[in-house]
UniProtKB/Swiss-Prot annotation:
Any one of the GO CC terms: cytoplasm
Gene it is expressed from: argS
Enzyme Commission code(s) on record: 6.1.1.19
Residue numbers covered by motif 'HIGH' region: 113-123
Record's protein name: Arginine--tRNA ligase
Lineage: Bacteria, Pseudomonadati, Campylobacterota, Epsilonproteobacteria, Campylobacterales
Keywords: Aminoacyl-tRNA synthetase, ATP-binding, Cytoplasm, Ligase, Nucleotide-binding, Protein biosynthesis
Length: 529
């Protein structure tokens, strides 16, 4: 809709302009301060220029134009809103979607938690954010690919095997064992030990030579748990890349780096000269004993990603990884790629409360709040909504009990209630959407037109949210639209009114926007409550 409007304005004005959205919709749906930028050039006051420009729109079929204090205000006509509404309702699930784009293909890597335990609260924000970003991008017509990088080649995998062995001997065999300072603990480790006992027998827990075999067995079980947990909140990741499998590319990748002349040897170790591109220190890629560092694994993986030739790459990380960005981007540059094609999105911390107090740690995980525990308590919908309700650059704190309330203080309840309410109204009227598709919206009053306008701007909201990476704009939009609908419905009679069918059509558009936006954040709209 916005593109149609901009095209119409440009056709009449014949020059570029900025289109704004006034906060007060009673004044206008859109406005431009063009007259202010023309004042110096034309040597006239903005008020005089705006008055002259407004006259050029007298015959527009799209909007009524007025000049107010130097601004050009555009109020959309009912006929145009009716046409857009009818198209939206006919498109159904495809409403607010874009045509397949030839550029802008995007590779999104997110979560990438170590395969050593179930997903916990620290992973949830990035998981929900990444999946929502992918859903919106796909809906807008971008080619999107999502991937989870499995960190299965480091010391943490050896430690997983050791932890399983010790848990078996301690819990299953009741032996006195000495645990290291760092190890994985929790009921899930004991569960894995039980499964290993069934498959391999008791001997594997005492044979150090088989620790890696035990670790791989545990890793596979943990990955199954992770995939199940993700499926429980509607997240399906397309690719799963193994760090261990990619290590066969270590030598070719090192050779590729060397061609940049930004690698050197020092005391037997191999460094990249990342300080030349703004890093605090040069970084070791291969240790003096020949073992690759964690950075080496990331370099190999990003070389693999860039070889797949997407236009844009996004990594979604925890905020504590901020210091890692410069070294990785330097390495990508040394590999011969444009490091600006990689965008790092950082997730700030999450604090979880229950009845105003810190949420209790899970026995299953030993020392963490598990994602599955939260889903069990509040459901997938509430979890997904709350985790995109605030900018990723801000810390997030919420109370579980607040999300269980069935009133307007609980945003997901209030939004779903709006959608269910529309269905209830249609049922009471004994009509379907197809029955009111041809009802005219031209003669609706300003309040109704403003509600309709708010419902129809979803495409703009999605484009803005995706481009700015500020996904909270979608949840903010949902809250605003639901509130506007409830207010309008409470103030206006629908069933039995003279314009019943027109209002039902308006409500159908509202429900479509609510349903579409909810689906793009991974929530199925409720038809009844």
């Amino acid at each position: 809709m916005k593109e149609i409007i901009k095209s119409e304005i440009f056709k009449i004005l014949g020059r570029d302009f900025v289109l704004e959205k006034p906060k007060d919709k009673s004044l206008a749906h859109y406005a431009t301060p063009l007259a202010f930028s023309l004042a110096k050039e034309l040597k006239k006051s903005p008020v005089a220029i705006a008055n002259e420009l407004a006259c050029k729109f007298e015959n527009s079929k799209i909007f009524e134009v007025s000049a107010v204090n130097g601004y050009l205000n555009f109020k959309l006509k009912g006929e145009f809103l009716d046409e857009i509404s009818k198209d939206a309702l006919k498109n159904g699930d495809k409403f607010a979607s874009g045509k397949a784009r030839q550029d802008g293909s995007t590779f999104i890597e997110y979560i990438s938690a170590n395969p050593t335990g179930p997903l916990h609260i620290g992973h949830v924000r990035g998981a929900v954010y990444g999946d929502t970003l992918a859903r919106i991008g796909t809906h807008l017509g971008y080619k999107i690919f999502t991937e989870y990088y499995i960190n299965d080649a480091g010391n943490q995998i050896d430690l997983l095997g050791t932890s399983i062995s010790l848990a078996a001997r301690d819990v299953l065999f009741h032996e006195n064992v000495e645990y290291p300072q760092k190890y994985y603990r929790g009921e899930y480790i004991v569960d894995i030990a039980n499964e290993a006992l069934k498959k391999f027998g008791k001997e594997i827990f005492y044979d150090e030579a088989r620790n890696l075999e035990l670790a791989e067995f545990g890793k596979d079980i943990v990955l199954d748990i992770i995939k199940k947990d993700l499926a429980g909140v509607g997240i399906s990741i397309q690719g799963w890349a193994s760090e261990k499998a990619l290590y066969k590319e270590l030598e070719p990748t090192i050779e590729k780096l060397k061609r940049s002349n930004q690698m050197y040897e020092k005391e037997g170790a191999t460094y990249i000269a990342s300080t030349t591109l703004g890093d605090d220190n040069d970084r070791v890629v291969v240790r003096n004993d020949g073992r690759p560092t964690y950075l080496a694994g990331d370099i190999i993986y990003h070389n693999d990603k860039f070889e797949r030739n997407y236009d844009h790459y996004i990594n979604i990380w925890g905020a504590d990884h901020h210091g890692y960005i410069a070294r990785l981007k330097a390495a990508i540059h040394f590999l011969g790629y444009d490091e600006n094609r990689l965008e790092i999105i950082l997730m700030q911390m999450v604090s979880l409360l229950k009845d105003g107090k810190p949420y209790k740690m899970s026995k299953r995980a030993g020392n963490a709040v598990l994602m599955s525990d939260i889903v069990e308590e509040i459901g997938s919908d509430a979890l997904r909504f709350i985790f995109i309700s605030k900018a990723n650059t801000s810390s997030l704190e919420f109370d579980i009990d607040e999300l269980k309330k069935e009133d307007s203080s609980n945003p997901i309840f209030y939004i779903n209630y709006a959608h269910a309410r529309v269905n209830q109204i249609f049922a009471k009227a004994g009509k379907s959407v197809s029955d009111v598709l041809d009802a005219s919206l031209e003669n609706l009053d300003d309040n109704a037109k403003n509600l309709l306008f708010e419902a129809l701007i979803l495409p703009e909201i999605l484009e803005d949210a995706f481009a700015s990476r500020q996904l909270q704009k979608v949840s903010d939009y949902l809250k605003s639209l639901a509130a506007s609908f409830h207010k309008f419905y409470n103030e206006n009679r629908v069933i039995g009114s003279a314009n019943e069918e027109s209002l039902l059509k308006l409500f159908a558009v509202v429900a479509l926007s609510l349903r579409t936006a909810l689906s793009l954040i991974g929530i199925t709209a409720k038809d009844r409550m």
